């Protein structure tokens, strides 16, 4: 695209971090998430769509460590504006293992990451000073019965997967 503008191209980056103590790959590290975010910045600089790895866990099993590592890097990838994410779900042991159950967990995790990327919409309707006034000053003191709350539950709250 830099040579011939308009020519379709995807900037495929694949940075990996090594544990400096052992030399082993550390796909679930915070540094890996930072490198993927840095790749997104390069993609924007060159005005090309691109991808990088995120969602990899160093953990060998779908446990808390795996969830933490996968969530951190997937949210970082989303917030940095990465166009494509390789290995976004299911990958363990720094790409040496794969877990089908982690695909299910990853689906929920990626949904939460995408919700973070969407951000908070601030408009006259979403600030809802009239609803705040009616609830806090004249009403029950909570929003659980509010029509607006019931409507927003469908778009603003992502529930856990029910299996």
Q: How does the language model describe each region?
A:
Residues 101-161:
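Catalytic-core signal marking the mid-to-C-terminal active-site face
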Residues 1-109:
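Glycine-rich anion/phosphate-binding loop at the beta-strand->alpha-helix junction
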């Amino acid at each position: 695209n830099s040579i011939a503008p308009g020519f379709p191209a995807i900037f495929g980056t694949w940075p990996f971090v090594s544990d400096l103590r052992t030399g082993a790959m550390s796909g679930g590290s915070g540094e890996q998430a930072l490198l993927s975010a840095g790749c997104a910045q390069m993609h924007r600089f060159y005005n090309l769509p691109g991808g990088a790895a995120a969602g990899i866990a160093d953990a060998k099993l779908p446990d808390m460590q795996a969830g933490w590592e996968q969530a951190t890097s997937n949210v970082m990838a989303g917030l940095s504006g990465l166009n494509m994410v390789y290995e976004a779900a299911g990958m363990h042991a720094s790409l040496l293992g794969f877990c089908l159950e982690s695909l299910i967990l990853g689906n929920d995790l990626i949904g939460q990451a995408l919700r973070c990327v969407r951000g908070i919409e601030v408009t006259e309707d979403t600030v809802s000073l009239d609803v705040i006034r009616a609830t806090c000053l004249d009403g029950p003191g909570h929003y659980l019965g509010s029509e607006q709350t019931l409507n927003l539950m469908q778009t603003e709250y992502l529930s856990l997967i029910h299996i």
